[in-house]
A protein has these predicted regions:
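Membrane-interface coil-to-helix junctions
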Residues: 1-55, 76, 81-99, 201, ...
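Short juxtamembrane and helix-loop transition motifs at transmembrane-helix boundaries
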Residues: 7-14, 35-40, 59, 64, ...
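Hydrophobic alpha-helical transmembrane segments
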Residues: 26-27, 41-59, 225-244
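Cytoplasmic juxtamembrane regions at transmembrane-helix boundaries
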Residues: 65-66, 244-245
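Periplasmic/ER-lumenal interhelical loops and adjacent helix-loop junctions
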Residues: 10-14, 161-244
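Membrane-embedded helix bundles of polyisoprenyl
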Residues: 56-62, 70-149, 158-176
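Membrane-water interface of alpha-helical transmembrane segments
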Residues: 41, 45-48, 68, 129, ...
Length: 245
């Protein structure tokens, strides 16, 4: 899906008018503006490299308190997983860029910076995710949940984080509201539903990082017993860590 043309055409209007256009907004506009300086082919390469680098480094930093070995393992899992592989095969570079922002968002929200500094830095690290509606929403949810996980959380501060997170979704929320009448494809939910690519059902497939709907984007390792056993073991470790076991 990650297709770029050498000379992208200017947007027909300031506001996208179809569901498909909204789905790629404001990424298309940013790509068009940047194409005057950075060729679209180079933009693609930068997005892919940045997505993997940011995901690995961010996840490693997120668990750095657990030691170098844990940080290295977390970074490896963040960039070498069924989820990342599936999105690369689908050509979902912008989606991976949003995914890569999540550990950085958690780091910033849980930092000891002053509120204003934290909010400003939060917007900065969330900008790549906000290039697509999916990335913006997931980044917003992550920011709020990260704030709620703080020991010194307050309702007012969580509300402030939610307000900041809502702001970076405005580039696509406002066009959707102002244009109006833009309906979603009724066949979309069925076409893009979770797939049980592990043989263990859709929920286990998703929890193990898989579940992509396109058979061509499902790694062959998803049907390998050894790989599945390793994935289940990793899932068990994650659950144990969350429960504090």
């Amino acid at each position: 899906d990650f297709v770029a043309v050498p000379e992208p055409a200017a947007p027909l209007s300031l506001l996208p008018t179809t569901a498909s256009a909204l789905r790629a907004w404001p990424l298309d506009a940013v790509s068009w503006v940047a194409s005057g300086v950075v060729p679209t082919g180079v933009q693609q390469q930068l997005i892919l490299v940045a997505a993997l680098a940011l995901a690995g480094v961010g996840t490693g930093l997120l668990v750095r308190h657990a030691g170098a070995a844990a940080a290295a393992a977390a970074a490896w899992v963040a960039i070498w997983s069924p989820y990342v592989t599936g999105r690369l095969l689908l050509g979902h570079g912008p989606t991976l860029l949003g995914y890569a922002c999540l550990p950085w968002i958690v780091i910033v929200v849980r930092s000891s910076l002053r509120t204003r500094q934290r909010h400003l830095l939060l917007v900065v690290v969330a900008i790549p995710a906000s290039l697509t509606p999916w990335g913006g929403v997931v980044a917003a949810v992550t920011a709020v949940l990260a704030d709620l996980s703080r020991g010194d959380r307050t309702l007012a501060r969580s509300a402030a984080v939610a307000a900041v997170a809502s702001a970076w979704c405005l580039p696509w929320v406002l066009p959707a509201v102002l244009v109006g009448g833009v309906g979603a494809d009724p066949d979309g939910p069925a076409a893009f539903a979770l797939a049980g690519d592990s043989g263990l059902g859709t929920w286990f497939s998703a929890l193990m990082g898989g579940g992509v709907w396109a058979a061509g984007a499902q790694p062959l390792s998803r049907s390998d017993p050894v790989a599945l056993a390793a994935s289940l073991g990793l899932l068990g470790c994650a659950v144990a860590a969350v429960l504090g076991l």
